Amino acid sequence: MKELYSLFMKPKDPLHFNAVKIMISSPERIREWSYGEVKKPETINYRTFKPERDGLFCARIFGPIKDYECNCGKYKRMKHRGVVCEKCGVEVIQSKVRRERMGHIELASPVAHIWFLRSLPSKIGNLLDLTLRELEKVLYFDSYIVLDPGDTPLTKGELLTEEKYRQMVQEHGSGFVAGIGAESIKQLLAGLDLEKLAVELREEMSKTNSMAKRKKLAKRLKIIDAFRESENRPEWMIMDVIPVLPPDLRPLVPLDGGRFATSDLNDLYRRVINRNNRLKRLQELNAPDIIIRNEKRMLQEAVDVLFDNGRRGKTITGASKRPLKSLSDMLKGKQGRFRQNLLGKRVDYSGRTVIVIGPNLRLHQCGLPKKMALELFKPFIYNKLEEKGYVTTIKAAKKMVERETPEVWDTLDEVVREFPVMLNRAPTLHRLGIQAFEPILIEGKAIQLHPLVCTAFNADFDGDQMAVHVPLSIEAQAEARILMMSTNNILSPAHGDPIIVPSQDIVLGIYYMTREKPFAKGEDRVFSSREEVRCAFDAGEADLHARVHVRMGDERVKTTVGRVLLSEILPEEMPFSAVNRVMNKKVLAGLIDMCYRTAGIKATVLLADRLKDLGYEYATRSGLSISIKDMTIPHRKSEILDQAFDLVKEIERQYNEGLITEGEKYNKAVDIWAKATEDVAAEMMKEIATTEVGGPEGEARVVEAFNPIFMMADSGARGSKDQMRQLAGMRGLMAKPSGEIIETPITANFREGLTVLQYFISTHGARKGLADTALKTANSGYLTRRLVDVSQDVIISEPDCGTMDGIEVEALLEAGEIIQRLGDRILGRIAQEDILDPVTAEVLVPMGTEIDEQRVQLIEDAGIEKVNIRSALTCRSLRGVCTMCYGRDLAQGKLAQIGEAIGIIAAQSIGEPGTQLTMRTFHIGGTASKSIERTSINNRYAGTVRFLNLNTVHNRDGDLIAMNRNGEISIISESGRERERYVIIYGAKLKVTDGQPVEPDTLLAEWDPFTTPILTEVAGAAKFGDIVEGQTMQEKLDPVTGKSSKVVVEYRESDVRPRISIKDDKGKTARVGEGGFARYFMPVGAILMVNEGDAIFPGDVLARIPRETTKTKDITGGLPRVAELFEVRKPKEHAVITEIDGVIGFGKDTKGKRKVIVSPEVGDARDYLIPKGKHISVHEGDYVRAGEPLMDGSPNPHDILTVLGEKEVAKYLVDEVQQVYRLQGVKINDKHIEVIVRQMLKRVRITDPGDSEFLMGEHVEKPIFEEINSKLTEEDKRPAAAEPLLLGITKASLSTQSFISAASFQETTKVLTDAATAGKVDYLLGLKENVIMGRLIPAGSGLRTYREVRK
């Protein structure tokens, strides 16, 4: 009985283990696993369908085909359990052992394992110091290798050709030993003394000075050390015996019609067995050497193909011309074991169907079709029916459910009540793509979804489908309810603002409610309370839009009826002022945010639901609709267009007269049209946005229009100003697919209709948009995958790591304007030191406290500009990040809890908006979004002008001209605080003087945005140097205008440097500043503006460099730029940056490059070579600081790291990534990018190993490095030195500690090969490894601390 009982027992927890180790298996190990040798290539007998004996499916080796039944049928049933049949040799046992029992094949001749041979760097090659070519020659029987030179002049490991070998044998006879094939390689490997080798190599390394040699030695040492430290033997990389996979993992399935479907592995094994058997037979027959050799080579190839098809030689194809899937292919790629079956499993208890809107659901509910619920909750229903006594057996319950009797439906209702289900919409780009709801049973076949959660799911109702999943265990239900319920996910984890915000109809309805209409019924009446207003409205005495006065508390408030009705749904804690305005989408989002912060989560949920109901009701009542009459075309449109045409004509004239180049003509034309489009749009908005309403007494008031199109755009419900511009203004400039802007715009709008040509130009942009969208999705998904992989194991690991370090944050400025306030950047972070009031020096925020909304207000009021905060970048936790360094968990609005998987949240927050980023496209059906070039700066606040680091001269017209690069103008308020600051472009005309008081909006400076001038600071006569026509300068004749201009061209000679010098009246070169000379070097492409001998005044333009033809403003924009930053690739034409502070000088030019010399006050000068034709942005005598670029272009992040250190490079990466997202209007909190950058900066490169075991140039994780160094210091040994290392996200993911995680990411075979040689142990610390091993993840409720609670 006991035995029977053990059969039905539930299996206990699967094998409990703490780590996984991977090794190379020894031949003994393989024989140990095996249950018998496979000797024949046969599979099964096609007539009896029984497996052949000793074949690939042999029942004697692998176990019976049917449960408890031997092959010949002598023993059947349970009573013979464990008996081995004497007739057919099959053990009587469950057939599932065929999934786990392995066999083996004894090879007649050893073969090399292809992974250890071909996976670069080749493991076998590195141990023997042979190249891959040489190794293959030996293994594939092309050359002999010397095993023992004996008394000959040969060396061990030398290769001999066939002829050379014969010759040596004739000369020396058997005085030396050489071999061929895998046997000889095996002999060499077995004879290696690794300890001795390692010592020799280390010595050699310390002696050599050549970098290349050192790298090579380090590579070899790494592999030798791996073998030394693991228990692997090098000769195991050559195999005498190969394992055979259990047959049920490579099944053979009979199809109808007597044919079989088989796994490719069976074909591959069959080839190996056939060749092996043939080789054995040939060896027995003592066949000639050449035949045996050929057979051995074929065996080696067959085994290669079995392990990794296509790695060497031709890919073997099956009968259907498709490549056969080898063992490696089973693991690799999206369809491989890792990503298909371990990381992405399909689950039971799930269903999917179309979604429809559920306008009367509460936020925590979803509508579930009864049919679906019945299927999903079957086991629960069976259980309940039995409990209630309707049925006695499961079978009866099943029948009852199939008949769908009334009791079944009642039971279903009971089961479903308060049972959360999870809804998921693919693609799940962030964690809000799966949320839990309580199901409400409905008729019909579609899931009903609450409209407010659509933003989070990115769902709409045009045929989207969603999947339902049922959490089965009590723990799963609790997690679904507490963590995943839609009501607990009001804030977005990416930026901490509410994500449950009304949109579309709801916004429109509430906007309509809160608008004011003049002369409405009941205008200016006074009411004593909200209730009174409600009565008047219900009785029809006051209109919804009437302006009224209402007593609120103890004051009288001017408001409208609609706003009072809206205020009825507000929670107590919120003031009436929150809704006493026109409510558009932005204001509504703010309302929900305010409610969350003041009244709490429950009130917010109720408010959201009530807003939804009100919004729908009033949107319906308003009866808004669009007609063609609503698109009013501005009266001044034709006038604006005529002006623009005239301006363009004027530019054409200037071009024809040769005053400007073709590029400038194009730039200016594009600019004029961009401005004209803006003007038409502004006129249209003016006309559509206001309307004059006549009163009963004939008086009129101008108010915001009730034009439906305007109302939809203005409320943020649908459409944008841009789209309105295209409907009723003009379509404007369009872009070619290449990204250039076509200089003739589309002057028509959709209301007027487009001509055929205009329509054709439009299709250009529109089609490119569609093609791009398809590419973008794939690219964005790949970026997300890499981000998740690099940061998956970052979790909150401890409350405080105790670091004293942090980062400095200030408001983000661009062109003098604040784009992101300091408050927005520090909200929810922890102060790293006391934050003091700059005036009173009182502590506003003590060190180590959270900077919350109130404290942000204090900091901003005090006018503090820079704050030091804790950051993930400087966190000292060994694994993960501590709560203090991370700060607030944005989705909850309070400090993060231990176990929060912040790495994955960071990756999702950055990856999810990826699809909204451009792949260099232009929005709005391809209308070019070209910002009108800035040509001037105006201040925003009153104050006094201060010039900072600004050199100026007066030119011949008496204007002040800026003569240097990094000059700035700042506006100082009366209290002496700096209000704003602007960088002044070189060559700008300054309209104010230092110390001048200015009013707001004064013109400070202006410049020509389309050219960069080269100016002189001194007076004198112009003298050309090395400017020779036909060599370095050409008179370029403009074909259209017949005018000529002098242009500097590319020149061959390296010592020629075209320049203009300014000579004084004595004919000497004039002096500039402290000992510099007035020589100006002309870059390629400069257009000379003066002639030889001209009289020159200070501030004159000697030459101008036309800017590149305007492409739409982003060099590498959008998604590719984000990927480039995270992969830290060198930008295409990266800027050279200076490594030291110093003064700029120019040296002798070399071939195609110009030499810039930076001379510091003390120490050696540094030379930088800059390609000719690149515009150098510094001048002789300029003072530069370390890290400043010397030319135009994006800097290379690696340079920033070496010059300015980790914090600066982190700051650069965070700011650059943010800039791309900001251009698209996407909000992401800095801390997410910091978490990713932390992972990129996790390692150091060893520069000096000291007394440690490290190798020169090895990459080591910081904690490990520090730990070993502290040990060395304790033992009074020399610690190792290292420099910080910045790895791209792909590189960083592949070099993680966990080989399981790395193998499931990319380059599976390489990762596994490296891991096996090193005998790596995976301690399963990250999330991914645990998912793959099928365990709970060590984050959130799966953390060890919480797991103990569960027990």
From Swiss-Prot:
The keyword Transcription applies. The keyword Zinc applies. Its cofactor is Mg(2+); Zn(2+). Its EC number is 2.7.7.6. Signal peptide: none annotated. CDD domains: RNAP_beta'_C, RNAP_beta'_N. Keywords: DNA-directed RNA polymerase, Magnesium, Metal-binding, Nucleotidyltransferase, Transcription, Transferase, Zinc. Binds 1 Mg(2+) ion per subunit. Binds 2 Zn(2+) ions per subunit. GO terms for molecular function: DNA binding; DNA-directed RNA polymerase activity; magnesium ion binding; zinc ion binding. Belongs to the RNA polymerase beta' chain family. The RNAP catalytic core consists of 2 alpha, 1 beta, 1 beta' and 1 omega subunit. When a sigma factor is associated with the core the holoenzyme is formed, which can initiate transcription. This is DNA-directed RNA polymerase subunit beta'. The lineage of its organism: Bacteria, Pseudomonadati, Thermodesulfobacteriota, Syntrophobacteria, Syntrophobacterales. The gene is rpoC.
